[in-house]
């Protein structure tokens, strides 16, 4: 395998610096998506149906161009299976003309999405309870199909071994395997575990120029897609570790699931870009292939407008997925801790935040005989040898700014000052900060202390740096009089300064850390700016220092100049990593309850989540060590062993979502287009607050009481549930009736929740409470989030 990787690296390395052989040649033309709702040809289209749909797209665009042939040349994707629309290279004026067509729901630019980049399953409790565990009850996700839309897959990873697997489930309608074999390999790239792999790059090439044909493959050259897919559905692999830490058995949440890879994210430099037209094509194909769960570990890096729920590719794709009984799970984003930054917020998307687990990759720093614990994957220095510390700002080149040197940006450090020392740099990125180490190494440093900024809080990341590095919590800068050179940073009583002596211990793995989970400071936060009545994120899952399978082609650090290749596993962080944890859990529930809807699976995971850590105290926020709230973790931290048998669920149908869109003020013609072009009449009696969501959010309360309705479906044995509430500060909550009795599975009961703000409630400030139904065995919890106008 090693020689094959080396050969592949030699073959492709020249292209990695000169990949885009042809520039984009379309002048002012850009890639637009023309969205037209759903097809009327039904869930199992024939080849004639597909041809007819594509012809209708040619006809529509041809009416604008005055030429059907020109329309064929302009269209790069015809979404002809389940999503109705096409992607085409258009002038702005042409896009505006198409938008006037009454059959068109929306026309929008194909957006650039960014990636939201072992022990975790033990931390989630899957190993503890034998026959009562979610793994046992969910048969390890057996024959559930998880589709991953990402950077592709490294098929040779043992995480995708099909040893012991039977025939591929008959529900699978895919089978295409667009992965080139490694040089000299006779092994099939897809098998009974990895049952399909496709790639989509037309929109990427439209924006950036054509890729070399050697790169036209679903093979993962980045590592992100392999990591996320193995986290969701990877097989058991003993002896998984990276840089001699984290030794254990790697596995996914649904280790016996079948998996499929859809490559839409492309990059020769980190991070990869995923263009919306490619994403939509992949989702349309995944629906048609017959997946049960779709994992999407990326999103836009900005908040779209309130009108944009149907100008966002992931939102559109997820809507069509749920209409075919497929759950789409997406990452919340890495733009925290700023409020209102959460991505992927449509109510039909399952949105996942990131938090820590109880394992650390740790290294001790001894600074002037004071011990400081930090995070590290790799320290290759003699543990008893002391090195001199230099602050990066004291080693800056004359032409470098103070800020650039503080962040150890490229070309800022003076080699004559840094050589042979430990350099202290300030961490710039919220997720990945490997470039700082490259600058320090280039300048001759022996190691680096990477000090968090306040925005990073106390989320410590063990990253695959290019040399010995330890990440430490933020240390306040010591003020200096004007004109005095800054030579120290740190706590006022004990600042670090140039000339201090430093020792670094070897990196080691520590288990049973407390408290855990803690909300990652980078995890994007609510409130939901697009649909304020829907709490987002939905839940949190492990997303810090996650060890999983990796592309053996990619460098450990993802830096092109990093020649360390051949890693079977790597440690990454981000909501990209927490997202597939939820997808893996969803796979278990789908195997256990194959008839459940996506909303029921989502409800089960949400209503059984916890807001307590492993010390039985409220979950903290790593940003400032205060208590986290529902805008950080949604309903709480996932608990798969409880989600597998939740007692009650809040179910939703396509009609419920259409009524929600009616109440949200969307055009009735648009709603009919989403309803497979069948007329849908908005009754006018629905409120956005009445969507049967497992959480309750009321963002515009006055002093007058507000009544909302919820319906629960019994999925457990006959029992009587009683309600309890924890009212938000300044508000009262009443539930009618206070008890619900169920005599059979599938029985539905409706209750009302009356919420009233008092004059003591603070205006324009969110407060938090919850509602719980319990029968003595199950606890079905819904967070309540309220704000007085």
Swiss-Prot record:
In this protein, which residues make up the domain named Inhibitor I9?
32-116
Query: Can you name a GO cellular component term?
Result: extracellular region
Protein's name according to its UniProt entry: Subtilisin-like protease Glyma18g48580
Residues spanning the signal sequence: 1-27
GO MF term list: serine-type endopeptidase activity
Task: Give the residue ranges for region: Disordered.
Answer: 468-499
- What's the EC number here? 3.4.21.-
Similarity section? Belongs to the peptidase S8 family.
Q: What class of enzyme is it?
A: hydrolase
Instruction: Please name one Pfam family that this protein belongs to.
Output: PA
Alphabetical GO biological process terms: proteolysis; response to symbiotic fungus
Q: Which residues form the active site?
A: 150 (charge relay system), 224 (charge relay system), 576 (charge relay system)
The Peptidase S8 domain sits at: 120-644
Coarsely, its chief localization is secreted
Q: Where in the cell is it found?
A: Secreted
Ranges for the PA domain? 401-489
Keywords (alphabetical) are:
Hydrolase, Protease, Secreted, Serine protease, Signal
* Tissue specificity note: Expressed in roots, stems, flowers and young leaves. Barely detectable in matures leaves.
Q: What induces it?
A: Not induced by wounding, methyl jasmonate, methyl salicylate or etephon.
